[in-house]
C-alpha cells in the first residue's frame, strides 16, 4: 500500500495540478524579497563567497544548494505562497550564524546589527497590506510586510453570520462555503471566533468545496453537502478562468438552476457584507444525474 501511495504522489503532475497558482517568476521574486529583503540575501551571498575563498568555509554551499533546489521546484510547479517561504528559513538562519561566527571586523558587526535592527523595526510599522500576491508591486530592499494584524471593519458582521449559521444548521449536518476570496472564504468563518477570542457554541461543521479547476477534480462535496453558503457576485482569488467551478456554481444557485434545484433557500440567513450578498441553501433531496451533467457541461466546455 505504502509503495503504491508513494509512487502515486511522486508521479503526479503537480505542474498541471497547481497551474491555477502559477504566476510569473517576477511574482515569486517580489514575494521572497517582501519577506527577506534584497540586502539581507545579498549580504549572505557575498559573505558565503568570501568565507569560501578566505576561510575555506564550505558548509554554506549545502545551504545554498538546498534553497536553490526549493526555488526551482516551486518555479516549475507554482508560485510561492507565504507558507512556502518557511522552507528557506533553516538555511538562512545557518548562513547568518556562520557569517557572524567569521566576522573579524568591528564595522562588519556594527553593520549586521544595524541591518537586524532595521528589519525588526520596519515590520512593525503600520502600512497597507496587499490583498493578494499579485498586488505586490516591486521587489523590496528590506522586508516590508507588517507583523501587525489586519483590521477589518466588518468583523461584527462576520461574527453575526457565523453565529446565525451555528444556530441554523442542524447538528450533524455539513456546511460548505461557496466563496474563495480574501473577503469571504471557509477559513475566515472557521477562524472568526478563535481569532477574536470568542467562544464557539458548537464544533466545526464546515467542509471544503471545490474551488480551483486544475486542483479540485472531485466535485462530490458540492453534490452531497447538507447546506451551502453562497456569496454573490462570485468570490474568487485567482486569475479569471482558474475558478470556473465557483463561478458556475454561484450562477446555478442565483438562478436556481440544475444542481441548485436540490436545495431550498433559508431566507432568514440572507445578509450583505461589504457589498457581497450572502445566502444559505439547505439540500432537501439528492442531486439528479441530469442536473449534475448539465452543470458539469458548463465547466468542461
Located regions from the model:
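Transmembrane-lumen/periplasm boundary regions of multi-pass, lipid-linked membrane glycan transferases
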Residues: 1-59, 68-78, 122
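Membrane-interface junctions at the ends of membrane-embedded or membrane-associated helices
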Residues: 50-59, 96-114
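Aromatic/acidic, Gly/Pro-rich catalytic loop(s) in extracytoplasmic/lumenal soluble domains
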Residues: 223-301
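Hydrophobic/aromatic-rich transmembrane helices and adjacent perimembrane loops
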Residues: 38-43, 61-63, 71, 78-105
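Extracytoplasmic
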Residues: 171-172, 176-224, 234-248
